[in-house]
């Protein structure tokens, strides 16, 4: 590995000892030699740190947060200590496929300086890939990114980003939507969509609709509603006008999510007011009627509706 490697793989982790070992193994078996791995432990309370230290490889750097700050803050910490020209984000429960960094290196050598992000594909546990539908070969500016994101069923992709861009656009601290970063990035920089599958998403969480999991979900939704509302409001403030023109479906979803967050946060009067205004504009939005109906009954019924919807989608 050179003093300034080509890639820094940044892996945020919280209470995932088994999964982080799998993610690290997927990095260390890469044939491309010019990379480092920065693991950011977001104040885990189990053996996650010990799991990382069981890999005494000089390419791995372990950083630790004193307090749990969320995945975006952990990624920012990793980027701040990265030396690579390109940043590769990898979730702790996912893994790079064999040869992934070789593919990234080849693609990085082919792109002009005007391209600041390479978007690679994920392999999903349920089959198929994302993003879907395929947009391989397209170079997306701000408006192109909005139109693309508005039309896809699966929008997640593996990010390979020039480190220099983080001086202009950083991930939002706290627990607001990561989507803010992608929109802010798209307004400043261009993304090349690529056909190569470089990583696998693993679904390690059991999707069992137990009473305990439902109650945890409800508590989490209510506790995080104010922060989620902040994220939605930030997106609408920064990008609402462009979204309404280039991504009307996404814009409509954000308006409904704002209503949902208001109701879950206990701001019932404002939530119902915005809800009726939303339905006046979109009377055929069945999910809008469902949100308003459940929210009128209280925070718990609305959170339960979200729980059932999440299990149905899974």
Task: Indicate where each model-derived feature is located.
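Short, well-formed alpha-helical segments that are part of the catalytic scaffolds
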Residues: 15-29
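Acidic helix N-cap motif at the loop->helix transition within catalytic regions
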Residues: 21, 46-54, 95, 99
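A conserved acidic beta->alpha catalytic loop
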Residues: 26, 41-50, 67, 91
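Glycine-rich, basic loop-to-helix element that forms the pyrophosphate-binding segment
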Residues: 65-82
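Short aromatic/hydrophobic "clamp" motif used to bind/position activated sugar donors
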Residues: 87
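Conserved donor NDP-sugar-binding/catalytic core segment of glycosyltransferases
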Residues: 99-132
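Conserved nucleotide-sugar donor-binding catalytic segment
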Residues: 132-216
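C-terminal subregions of glycosyltransferases and related glycan-biosynthesis enzymes
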Residues: 196-314
